[in-house]
Curated annotation (Swiss-Prot):
GO terms for molecular function: carboxylic acid transmembrane transporter activity; sialic acid:proton symporter activity. It holds the Pfam family MFS_1. SUPFAM superfamilies: MFS general substrate transporter. NCBIfam families: 2A0112, PRK03893.1. The gene is nanT. One of its GO terms (cellular component) is plasma membrane. It comes from Escherichia fergusonii (strain ATCC 35469 / DSM 13698 / CCUG 18766 / IAM 14443 / JCM 21226 / LMG 7866 / NBRC 102419 / NCTC 12128 / CDC 0568-73). It is a multi-pass membrane protein. This is Sialic acid transporter NanT. CDD domains: MFS_SV2_like. It catalyses: N-acetylneuraminate(in) + H(+)(in) = N-acetylneuraminate(out) + H(+)(out). The keyword Ribonucleoprotein does not apply.
Length: 496
């Protein structure tokens, strides 16, 4: 940027069309967050009505994560082939229909299937909305684009918590899911009133359709084998997370089978850059493992261990959700200032100072607990707002929606595992201790993976001929693309 451009406030670098594109995507993501977290709010009510165990109840949260990898792949490929806008609208319709089905569910299996549909829609919304906004904004503002957008999910969670406190005591838990059908009206408006993403239009202007991940996996020479592996992965995940298996060894074997299938898909679709894709899935896996025990089971912790009533639960969840929303925006500013990876590491390190006090303070002082949760979620959860930008930078435009959607949502299986891990540990410890210890320990893994830029580093170790040295979104260099000390030595040579 020129000196003159740098002196202009950041928001003046955006025109009306770019703001409209962002606003539409942000509202879509808000509705996504609203629909998705409803199950966490009414988990105890559903558990009581259906007579579920704690692990079975937690698996209803996990169900949406089980289908996300496939939704991210399919709807991401739709976004790469036909445009980000169509994929975004389709995603909203999917998760809205799934939410309505939850309201009519007569039992556990039906609700589990409805949650699978929600997961597919959520995955598509994440990948399509994120690429849509990031590709519509100027390069030097794309961390802000990512962070501001993802804040919509947390705002949706806050709105859902407030609606829960008003609706459920009067009309029961099913009424909450009936409200979730409203996003379809918004989807119809989106289809007519928002432009296509600029990067996608420039890349595809006058050119033949791109070969998407769906084309490679399900229309290529290995399509039969890939269809069989897809069914095998879906079946394995069903048995792992539907509460049907009690043998940890069998679950571990099925988990390894799924991992092998997903790695195979990544190798086929990304070629020599598969080490980067696999490591991105690992990064996201641990990002969900550290954050989602709290996201999924915090309402249960507040209602059972702290004995809060629905109104107090809603107030505490407001602090938590609002903190995450503010953190997404703060993360956007930090990312554009410090760089994406450095901002991520600094924010997570600061959040570690708060995670133990959150679960050690107890429930005597609601306001202190709410304040601690606000800052912990702002620093620990909010920084994930720039995760789409971090992942998207490793993929070219014509593969970005599917690449982001697939890697992110395969890694998001950590979100399926997280509440079940928390519930299992809580059978031996109290739930607060289980949530705090999981989050505290696994956050350090994410700090190392992102701080050391392991996707680029492992790519350099295994397939250096396909190494990308600079971020495809903002053009900044990847620190893991060069050995330790090389950049410093180059700087010394330049000065001399």
């Amino acid at each position: 940027m020129s000196t003159t451009t740098q002196n202009i406030p950041w928001y003046r670098h955006l025109n009306r069309a770019q703001w409209r594109a962002f606003s539409a995507a942000w509202l879509g993501y808000l509705l996504d967050g609203f629909d998705f977290v409803l199950i966490a709010l009414v988990l105890t009510e559903v558990q009581g009505e259906f007579g579920l165990t704690t692990v079975q109840a937690a698996s209803l949260i996990s169900a949406a994560f089980i289908s996300r990898w496939f939704g991210g792949l399919m709807l991401g490929a739709m976004g790469d082939r036909y445009g980000r806008r169509l994929a975004m609208v389709t995603s909203i319709v999917l998760f809205s229909v799934g939410t309505l089905a939850c309201g009519f569910a007569p039992g556990y299996i039906t609700m589990f299937i409805a949650r699978l549909v929600i997961g597919m829609g959520m995955a598509g919304e994440y990948g399509s909305s994120a690429t849509y906004v990031i590709e519509s904004w100027p390069k030097h503002l794309r961390n802000k684009a990512s962070g501001f957008l993802i804040s919509g999910f947390s705002v949706g969670a806050v709105v859902a918590a407030q609606v829960y406190s008003l609706v459920v005591p009067l009309w029961g838990w099913r009424a909450l899911f009936f409200i979730g059908i409203l996003p379809i009206i918004f989807a119809l408006w989106l289809r007519k009133n928002i432009p296509e993403a600029e990067d996608w239009k420039e890349k595809h202007a006058g050119k033949a359709p791109v070969r998407t991940m769906v084309d490679i996996l399900y229309r290529g020479e290995h399509r039969i084998a890939n269809i069989v592996m897809t069914l095998a992965a879906a079946t394995a995940l069903w048995f792992c997370f539907a509460g049907n298996l009690q043998n940890a060894a069998i679950v571990a074997v099925l988990g390894l089978l799924c991992a092998a299938i997903f790695i195979s898909f990544m190798v086929q679709s990304t070629g020599k850059r598969w080490p980067t894709g696999v490591m991105l899935m690992v990064v996201v896996l641990f990002a969900f493992l550290y954050s989602w025990p709290i996201q999924a089971l915090l309402p249960t912790y507040l209602k059972t261990e702290l004995a809060y009533n629905p109104h107090t639960v809603a107030n505490v969840l407001f602090f938590s959700g609002f903190g995450a929303a503010v953190g997404c925006c703060v993360g956007g500013f930090l990312g554009d200032w410090l760089g994406t990876r450095k901002a991520y590491v600094c924010s997570l390190l600061a959040s570690q100072l708060l995670i133990i006090p959150v679960f050690a303070i107890g429930g005597a002082n609601v306001w202190v607990l709410g304040l601690l949760l606000f800052f912990q979620q702002m620093l620990g959860q909010g920084i994930s707002g720039i995760l789409p930008k971090l992942i998207g930078g490793y993929f070219d435009t014509d593969q970005r929606a599917a690449g982001l959607g697939f890697t992110y949502n395969v890694g998001a299986l950590g979100g399926a595992l997280a509440p079940i891990l928390g519930a299992l540990i809580a059978q031996r410890l109290d739930l607060g201790t289980a949530l705090g210890s999981l989050s505290f320990s696994l956050t350090f893994v994410v700090i190392l993976l992102i701080g050391l830029d392991m996707p680029s580093r492992v790519q350099r170790w295994l397939r250096p001929e396909a190494l990308r040295t600079h971020d495809a979104i903002d053009g900044k260099p990847f620190s893991g693309a060069v050995p330790f000390g090389s950049a410093k030595n180059d700087l010394v040579k330049t000065k001399s």
